[in-house]
């Protein structure tokens, strides 16, 4: 079960959403180029996201991810086919979940707190990557204005900006408090047993509601835009201080 749905149902829904997204690329060269540049951005975002989960669990004393080969930056260890396709076409998605055993956590944290730390590590890594690539983007624009007018410069700048967007999108999407997304485990740490039980019992309905809201209100886009706007403002302010 995933998002309260069996795999067949999930795949059908994902296929419909992808087909709906394909229209924008037909006969549109710039859109196709953007799609191609999205692929390395997806690899970076998912790989570092899942590695962050594995790294956090390992540091807390759980060697499960290490034994399963997840403590690596090899993309093949972390990619989920459906989640990766969604990230390419829809701007949000997920990687292969990192399995952990909270009972292995050291005594510095409770199992619930440890799960929350491991869960938040993934989205946090995406936001850190987004900031790093924003700084690189600003540096190129500031110090190499002629370079960005060249064909290779335009491609590199587009790749950087796509990587920023994908990382912010992946981070925001995974903070949605619905199982099995990271946000559910973070929120779970602060909820009562009754509240957790209610969420699990209504998981399917909540999932459908979230997908409808995400696709018909563009709320993910609004949240991501505010986050990216904030990052740009901070990076611009930092550059203004020193340059």
Residue ranges: model-predicted function:
Residues 1-243:
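Hydrophobic transmembrane alpha-helices and their immediate loop junctions
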């Amino acid at each position: 079960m995933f998002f309260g749905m069996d795999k067949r149902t999930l795949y059908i829904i994902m296929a419909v959403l992808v087909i709906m997204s394909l229209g924008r690329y037909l006969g549109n060269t710039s859109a196709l180029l953007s799609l191609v540049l999205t692929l390395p951005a997806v690899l970076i975002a998912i790989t570092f996201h899942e590695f962050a989960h594995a790294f956090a669990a390992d540091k807390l004393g759980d060697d499960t991810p290490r034994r399963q080969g997840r403590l690596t930056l090899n993309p093949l260890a972390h990619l989920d086919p459906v989640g990766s396709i969604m990230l390419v076409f829809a701007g949000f998605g997920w990687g292969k979940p990192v399995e952990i055993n909270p009972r292995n956590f050291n005594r510095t944290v409770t199992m619930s707190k440890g799960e929350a730390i491991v869960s938040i590590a993934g989205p946090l890594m995406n936001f850190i990557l987004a900031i790093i690539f924003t700084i690189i983007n600003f540096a190129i624009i500031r110090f190499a204005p002629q370079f960005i007018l060249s064909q290779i410069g335009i491609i590199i700048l587009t790749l950087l900006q796509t990587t920023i967007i994908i990382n912010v999108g992946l981070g925001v999407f995974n903070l949605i408090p619905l199982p099995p997304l990271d946000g559910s485990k973070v929120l779970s740490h602060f909820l009562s047993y009754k509240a957790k039980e209610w969420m699990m019992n209504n998981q399917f309905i909540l999932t459908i509601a979230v997908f409808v809201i995400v696709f018909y209100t563009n709320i993910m886009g609004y949240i991501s835009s505010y986050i990216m706007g904030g990052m740009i403002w901070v990076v611009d302010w930092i550059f203004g201080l020193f340059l």
